[in-house]
Amino acid sequence: MDRIAITGGAQLNGIIPVSGAKNSAIKLMAASLLTDQPLRLTNMPRLADTKFLGKLLTRLGAQVDEREGLDGSETVLHAAEITSGFAPYDLVRQMRASFNVLGPLIARTGQAKVSLPGGCTIGARPVDLHLQALEALGAKIDLHEGYVYAQAPRGLKGAEITFPFVSVGATEHAMLAAVLADGVTHIHNAACEPELLDLQICLNAMGAKVEGAGTPTITITGVAKLHGATHSVIPDRIEMGTYAVAAAMAGGEVQLTRARPELIDSLLVKLEEAGAGVVRTEDGVIIKRDGTRLNAVDVETQPYPGFATDLQAQFMALMTTAKGESRIRETIFENRFMHAPELMRLGADISVSGGEAIVRGVDRLEGAEVMATDLRASVSLVIAGLVARGETTVSRIYHLDRGFERLEEKLGACGAQVRRIKGDAEGGPDHD
């Protein structure tokens, strides 16, 4: 398996262009199943996860054409005919979000057989809410031997859907299914993440009638048919936040371009509170820090627009060398401090109890061999390695390749001493 080696001590100075959002791109790709006309997605990230979903869409009958356009990478998806409604375990297990093809398949063809996603390394993330939403829309759902058998021979019907708790994936899934339902659907207690607004913009460009994405109530008036469209994927706020933290950690001055800093306001406020310089620009944000040591600050993960759980691991890495004691509370997912023991291998002083971690800043981290446990944890180890004395080697970096496009290249262009060490072919475990 490949590894990444980081030699600590170099400041970061330069420009990093932010890629399109992975968490938006994979749902937009699933939306291509809703029409028999081409959907052209620009500002597309080139990641392992988008490749996994492309393979699944191809299995279902879609044509997936990746190309380079004037605005960077783009993907054209054309599901002129759904030749199969079967999404097998060997593909769905590779990425949980691929389960979201279920709704579009039912909406367009009236039937589907989709594997349950399987296990997840970040605690319990059941798909019960997804299935309940589809049942509310009139789908008949049966579970048998690890597969979801879904039917709606007379089509889906508009419905009132109220989620008992906020779920980004379930909200997106309900939107994808309801756009072709007969009648009006109201989604209550909907997730408010910006990726949902991005999905709404794309669906409406395809002829859907969706209102309210980004608020707790989404209204969808079903239409009989969708058409093709061109849509630019929203910038990746998690990648943006990750490089912002990396710049604050290593010191120097990094300009993030093709970015929307308002999407990570909750993080930028904490960086300023810790003592980093934050300058918002027309095209993004500049993060800078001189040799002054950062101050410890507390964070608590919350649904958007609160502090993102997907930035918690990165921020913990930042706090390992801050002055004082930081309390980090994780309220979104259980078992999401698996990066803490690996950071401790680098010399971090961290205590974990339930959903809270206490980070006591140390003067210096020491390079060591560490292992990535999931996507965000893996990049937190790279961030810590930027300041650790000596060399830090991160293994199991297939996690990184799922969510960060050209990470070594982007950091290296700013002066980081980071390189990929090629290994044997990677299988990798099931992905979340």
Swiss-Prot record:
One GO BP annotation of this record:
cell division
Domain of life of the native organism: Bacteria
Q: Which SUPFAM superfamilies match?
A: EPT/RTPC-like (SSF55205)
Any GO MF annotation of the entry:
UDP-N-acetylglucosamine 1-carboxyvinyltransferase activity
Q: Does the keyword Cell division apply?
A: yes
InterPro entries listed in its UniProt record: Enolpyruvate_Tfrase_dom (IPR001986), Enolpyruvate_Tfrase_sf (IPR036968), MurA_subfamily (IPR050068), RNA3'P_cycl/enolpyr_Trfase_a/b (IPR013792), UDP_GlcNAc_COvinyl_MurA (IPR005750)
Q: Describe the reaction catalysed, as an equation.
A: phosphoenolpyruvate + UDP-N-acetyl-alpha-D-glucosamine = UDP-N-acetyl-3-O-(1-carboxyvinyl)-alpha-D-glucosamine + phosphate
Q: Which UniProt keywords apply?
A: Cell cycle, Cell division, Cell shape, Cell wall biogenesis/degradation, Cytoplasm, Peptidoglycan synthesis, Pyruvate, Transferase
| Top EC class of this enzyme | transferase
2-(S-cysteinyl)pyruvic acid O-phosphothioketal is found on 120
Q: Name one GO cellular component term.
A: cytoplasm
Annotated residues that bind phosphoenolpyruvate are located at 22-23
- EC numbers: 2.5.1.7
- Residues of the active site are 120 (proton donor)
Gene3D superfamilies noted in UniProt:
Enolpyruvate transferase domain (3.65.10.10)
**Where is this protein localized, as stated in its record?**
Cytoplasm
* Residues the entry annotates as binding UDP-N-acetyl-alpha-D-glucosamine: 96, 125-129, 310, 332
Pathway, per record: Cell wall biogenesis; peptidoglycan biosynthesis
**Reported function:** Cell wall formation. Adds enolpyruvyl to UDP-N-acetylglucosamine.
Q: Which NCBIfam families does the entry mention?
A: murA, PRK09369.1
Q: Could you say which protein family the record assigns here?
A: Belongs to the EPSP synthase family. MurA subfamily.
Q: What is this protein called?
A: UDP-N-acetylglucosamine 1-carboxyvinyltransferase
Q: Which organism is it from?
A: Caulobacter sp. (strain K31)
User: Which gene name belongs to this protein?
Assistant: murA
